[in-house]
Design a protein with these regions (language model features):
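Aromatic-lined substrate-binding rim segments of carbohydrate-active enzymes
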Residues: 1-68, 110-129
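Conserved, mostly hydrophobic/aromatic
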Residues: 38, 62, 92, 168, ...
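Aromatic- and acidic-residue-enriched carbohydrate-binding clefts of CAZyme catalytic domains
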Residues: 1-31, 72-100, 176-193
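Carbohydrate-binding surface patches
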Residues: 332-371, 377, 382, 421-422
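Structural recognition of the beta-strand scaffold that forms the well-ordered cores
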Residues: 45-48, 90-94, 131-134, 166-170, ...
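Noncatalytic carbohydrate-binding groove/subsite architecture in carbohydrate-active enzymes
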Residues: 107-259, 321-331
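Aromatic/acidic polysaccharide-binding cleft in carbohydrate-active enzymes
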Residues: 172, 223-338
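Acidic, Ser/Thr/Pro-rich beta/coil linker or hinge segments at domain junctions
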Residues: 371-411
């Protein structure tokens, strides 16, 4: 409840975090601290409201507290707590995982609650309307998607309300092991475990197509974004750590999962409007691990760093031909996978992943326009379980790749096994 996390820290309520670790939650990181972090990072804000155990009034008052500039009880309380100016809320999630830990609701029940709660997520700033995110499915639960959309689009509703939502969330985790009860460890796995993780990660493409097809029935103009706001590898925790803290190491296997998933998101950017890996620091597929004052960057961090050029760029159509298929149990895995975009200045970014744990492949990249070009490349590669530690923080890091040749508008290279290459063509 958000009011437990405002005001002087010494006066904030303490509670037991029954979901994660059974430790005392002192609410020292609340609304003000969250917005200060976003200010320092220079990132947009995505706030999630409590539908499972909170009231409509509580949610409405929180939005007022955060975004109303004038005189009102909640705006006055914000000012009393030290922040005169209202914040900007870019995205507001109305509930979280209400099919499970957020209330074990049926989709019809949640859909009606969503319609009610979102009504009171007011737009107090005309120049910065809040984008409302409806709680969508867990992985492949298309019944949830169908029933929630059916409920939200039912009459009475304004014709231009598009279901009272700007986005529909979806959660999907890659569990490399046999089941949730036997997920397998981050650093100890076989080649089968490598391909099992990649095969499950590639399933993201099927999920986006499945839920996207349902969205198309209600929203053919694609005004509603699919918000994949929890994704990534979920391993067993590192031995000796609190099971509720979800602390896990991060290897080249995680890097490849991130790479192929981001390539999938790129290719579905007409529907996927946001995607948030879970989570940034010390939890699940992190980009940063810390130990006291020390911090290290994970292989997944380097993938994000290499892929950053795709952001705010325009997708270019790309196809791979003559690619081997790796058969591993139930999984048929393409040996190579890619996505391509172009920035406003004309620079093309190609991100290419080799999903094979053992074999390198020659690649030719045919460019449709024959021009004089400058090509630079970075590579992230290593043994399939290679990872960074506090003793060896740079065991896995992106490096320059000099193995690109150009002739008559065609680029050629050999991509090593277990690697990701980012090409920049300008």
């Amino acid at each position: 409840h958000w009011k437990d996390g405002i005001g002087p820290k010494e006066n904030r309520k303490k509670m037991i975090n029954t979901h994660w670790g059974g430790v005392v939650e002192d609410n020292s990181f609340g609304t003000h601290e969250f917005f200060e972090l976003c200010r320092q990072l220079g990132c947009k804000t995505y706030v999630n409201g409590n539908v499972g155990s909170g009231t409509v009034q509580e949610m409405s008052e929180w939005v007022e507290y955060m975004t109303f500039e004038g005189v009102s009880p909640m705006a006055d309380l914000r000012k009393k707590n030290g922040h005169e100016k209202a914040w900007k809320v870019d995205y507001f999630g109305v509930g979280n995982e209400n099919w499970g830990c957020g209330g074990n609701m049926t989709p019809e029940y949640y859909g009606n609650l969503y319609r009610r709660y979102q009504t009171y997520v007011r737009h107090y700033q005309d120049s910065a309307p809040i984008q409302k995110i409806c709680g969508g499915p867990n992985a492949g639960d298309d019944n949830w998607t169908k029933k929630v959309l059916e409920t939200c689009f039912a009459s009475p509703a304004p014709e231009d309300a598009h279901g009272f939502m700007d986005g529909l969330s979806m959660h999907y985790y890659t569990v490399p092991g046999e089941s949730w009860m036997n997920k397998g460890f981050a650093t100890e796995f076989t080649t089968d475990g490598w391909y099992q993780a990649l095969g499950k990660a590639l399933h993201m493409d099927d999920l986006i197509k499945k839920h996207g097809a349902i969205l198309d029935q209600y929203d053919p103009e694609k005004k509603i974004g699919l918000i994949v706001d929890e994704w990534g590898n979920w391993h067993e925790v590192e031995p000796g750590t609190n099971p509720g803290f979800l602390y896990q190491q991060n290897t080249m296997r995680d890097a490849l999962v991130a790479a192929v998933t981001l390539n999938i998101f790129n290719k579905h950017c007409d529907r996927v409007k946001m995607a948030c890996i879970a989570q940034l620091i010390n939890v699940l597929q992190s980009v940063i691990l810390t130990e006291g004052e020390k911090m290290i960057l994970t292989p997944t961090y380097h993938i994000f760093h290499m892929y950053k050029y795709h952001q705010d760029a325009e997708l270019l159509r790309s196809d791979l031909t003559g690619v081997d298929t790796i058969q591993n149990g139930e999984f048929s895995i393409p040996a190579l996978q890619e996505s391509v975009s172009v920035q406003k200045d004309g620079t093309i970014t190609v991100t290419l992943a080799n999903l094979s744990a053992e074999q390198s492949y020659p690649v030719e990249i045919a460019l449709t326009e024959k021009k004089n070009r400058t090509v630079s490349a970075k590579i992230l590669t290593g043994a399939m379980n290679a990872h960074n530690t506090f003793e060896e923080p740079d065991a896995v890091k992106e490096e320059s790749f000099e193995g690109v040749a150009e002739k008559d508008g065609t680029l050629s290279l050999e991509i090593p096994a277990c690697s990701v290459i980012c090409l920049r063509i300008s």
